[in-house]
């Protein structure tokens, strides 16, 4: 398997930051109450991941090992500030909805973890690919979890899409069920914990079924030769 395919497999499935590494749970649980919020935070995290991986890879040979972590954090904080300003300018409603969780991207273990474990040891192109696929893996889990919680909690899908994509996106809103009252358990953090648990369980079931289909290799039987004195 090529290095690029390995990065895709690791980011999207085998080493998914949300379902396998269980990193970034704070924003994952708090913000994924709707697809719009989940997608907005996921895109912001993806952009910061790619930017930080590229930046760290570029300076990896010029930063002393003793101060590399503070330098990495400064790079990540600068990129998060840029993303925050862009969101404030072009998606102000979503910016208000996400609130403190945008600047908290700085402390997201996924970003500093990939910077330290991968970007600081690899060239720019592989580092950018790693950041993209890890970010896309995180975003996909956010969106799936957000869709589950929004459908169960409010009976809608893509509610508030205009906050992210503009006024035209209000037509994307789908009313799946009609509830007199919202199902708060799905919209609050306990519902997010339950949803993440279901997604992790589903992934484990799929992995176990895939392993069971693979042909089992029988271990060769090694016979010991007994040597006796003549």
UniProtKB/Swiss-Prot annotation:
Q: Where in the cell is it found?
A: Cell inner membrane
- At the top level of its lineage, which domain of life is listed? Bacteria
Instruction: State the membrane topology.
Output: Multi-pass membrane protein
- How does the annotation summarize its subunit structure? The complex is composed of six subunits: RnfA, RnfB, RnfC, RnfD, RnfE and RnfG.
PANTHER family attached to this UniProt entry: ELECTRON TRANSPORT COMPLEX PROTEIN RNFE, ION-TRANSLOCATING OXIDOREDUCTASE COMPLEX SUBUNIT E
Tell me which family the UniProt entry assigns to this protein. Answer: Belongs to the NqrDE/RnfAE family.
User: What does this gene product do?
Assistant: Part of a membrane-bound complex that couples electron transfer with translocation of ions across the membrane.
NCBIfam families hit by this protein: PRK12405.1 (NF009070), rnfE (TIGR01948)
Protein name per Swiss-Prot or TrEMBL = Ion-translocating oxidoreductase complex subunit E
Organism of origin is: Vibrio atlanticus (strain LGP32)
């Amino acid at each position: 398997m090529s290095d690029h395919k390995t990065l895709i497999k690791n980011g999207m499935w085998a080493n998914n930051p949300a379902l396998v590494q269980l990193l970034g749970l704070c924003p994952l649980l708090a913000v994924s109450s709707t697809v719009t919020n989940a997608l907005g935070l996921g895109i912001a995290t993806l952009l910061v991941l790619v930017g930080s991986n590229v930046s760290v890879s570029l300076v990896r040979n010029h930063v002393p090992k003793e101060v590399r972590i503070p330098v990495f954090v400064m790079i990540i904080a600068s990129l998060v500030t840029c993303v925050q300003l862009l969101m404030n300018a072009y998606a102000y409603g979503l910016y208000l909805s996400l609130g403190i969780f945008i600047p908290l991207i700085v402390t997201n273990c996924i970003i500093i973890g990939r910077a330290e474990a991968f970007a600081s040891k690899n060239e720019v192109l592989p580092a950018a690919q790693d950041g993209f696929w890890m970010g896309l893996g995180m975003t996909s889990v956010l969106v799936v979890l957000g869709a589950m919680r929004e459908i169960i909690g409010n009976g809608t899908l893509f509610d508030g899409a205009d906050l992210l994509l503009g006024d035209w996106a209000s037509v994307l809103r789908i009313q799946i069920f009609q509830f007199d009252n919202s199902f708060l358990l799905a919209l609050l953090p306990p519902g997010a914990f339950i949803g993440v648990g279901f997604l992790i369980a589903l992934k484990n079931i799929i992995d176990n079924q895939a392993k069971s289909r693979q042909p089992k290799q029988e271990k060769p039987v090694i016979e010991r030769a007994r040597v006796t004195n003549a």
